[in-house]
Structure formats: structure tokens, C-alpha cells
Amino acid sequence: MLVNREYIRKFLTNNDTKPVPYRWTHGATDEHLGDGLLIYSIIQLLRAKICVCLGSGGGFIPRIMTQARVDLYDTGIFEGDRDYNWGDIGVTYVVDAANKIGGNVDWLEEDSFLRKTFFPRIINETTEIAYKNFFIKEDIKIDYLHIDAGHSYEDVKRDFKQYSKLLSKNGIISIHDTDKNYENNYIVSEDIKDHYKFTDGPSKFIEEISDEWQRFDFFNEGILDTKPSSTGLTILRHA
């Protein structure tokens, strides 16, 4: 067995025994990481240290980012101080205004499972303000960027335009919710209308990506219709 299913179930796909909110959008289950496995693998392969997640309702991707970095240390790739954020293995930043637009967060309190287990650095602001008043001011270069904040076309385009300027030489960008076929098959209950058309912005934006970027779409909707599938993950890197 390549992966520790018990650890995955307790810490990555669940907050101990409670399912991580929105994990299903990644096609994840109790013992399966879904598209999170792609993100984990890319961070491992490219030795990414500075990881930034724009938007995260349940902290699923931030914890995978941190786990990948820690595992790089524990397997002898990273060396030095193992501290999760202030040592030699990099840092995971989560940027989220926690304004309930597009969903709720469950990790804002300091004693939340995510924060006391994986210790991400929280930027409780909009992505636009965080870009200007934190990342620019601290001259941060990003090795892995995950875009999953505002889902309108304008929001996704702005986040990409701004944060892509901060990428390191070998930096990677992933954009979530890019598979419009998933949305076409998904039934939204009347009480959460804010989830309607959640792929419209991301799927429209990726069609406009210039030749300066290599684009890889990872869609598994419809391959196995008896199991959860991802809402779409698109990976971008400089051509």
C-alpha cells in the first residue's frame, strides 16, 4: 500500500471523524484524496516550499500543501528546521475573507482542527487586498498557487493576473472548478443558490489562457458515475 489510508481518513479528508467541508468538490472520499493527490504530487516533485491557497472553505487543499512539504522533509529531500512555517520547509498561506460568499469556512477559530494540526498562516482578507498589502509588501515569491476564491469570471481573471506575477521560476498554478460538464450534471438545492454556475467563471477564464502558459485539464466527471468526481482542476505553468 503506497498511502496510509488511516492517516488520510483521520487528518486529510476528515477533521478527525467529521468530513472536511467541500472535499467532495475534489472528488475525495474518506480514504481517497481525489484531485488533491495531483497537488500533493506536484509539490513533492517540484520541491515547492511557498504554497498559497486563495479561498478554502474546509482547508482541504491547504492541509495537503502542508503535508506534502512536511513529507519532503521526513523523506530526506528537505533539510534543516522542520517547523511548519518558520523553518526550512517553506510555508502554507491561506487567503480568505471568510465573508460567506460562495460558502462558509470552518477553520477561522485558532483552535480549529486545521489550524491546530497543520498550522497554515491565515490572511483573513480579500485576495485583492492580500496581494497589495501582504504579498507585495513582503516580496513573496510563490512556488505553488491554488486559485479557488471568488468564482466569477472577473474574480478568477483578477486573481490570476495579480498572483501569477509572484510565481517563482518553476512556479505552478492550479485553478479549481474548471469543468463545466460537472456543473451541467450537478443538482443544486434551492437553499444554496450561491452555488449555481460555480464553474462559469473558472471554465470561461481558462479558455482565454495565452500561449505563454502550458495548460493541463484534469477532469474525471462521468468516468465512474457511482463515485464522487472532481469539479475540475486545471494546471498551468509557463511555456
Regions found by a protein language model. Give the residues of each.
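S-adenosylmethionine/decaboxylated-SAM
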Residues: 30, 40-239
